[in-house]
């Protein structure tokens, strides 16, 4: 019997809860690169995991502040297209509670169009593009 498949969980950090929602849906192993203190060693381990995982998943949400994950998904879709999976979620929630409750963040129309084009580019390169975590889990669990 072969080793269990493994997915690299790349994409939006910034206290986004997408990983917490996806992990219970997975029937395969995963590498979560989120750490409290990002160091050079963490970056080296992340590159190592991206290279050896069966799938490299990048989920982008409106809590994204940097753009490096976009570069990573395009890089992986060129270098490892059959292992690259991209998903962007239209909304995310800020963990902090304010007097109105949980703060919902969304992408504006131009950002949504741009991210849709990123997804289509990933597909043209041979990768997969999904719009929900349920679709992502379905693909990862069955391939």
Roles of regions detected by a PLM:
Residues 1-143:
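Conserved catalytic or regulatory cores that recognize and/or transform ribose-phosphate-containing ligands
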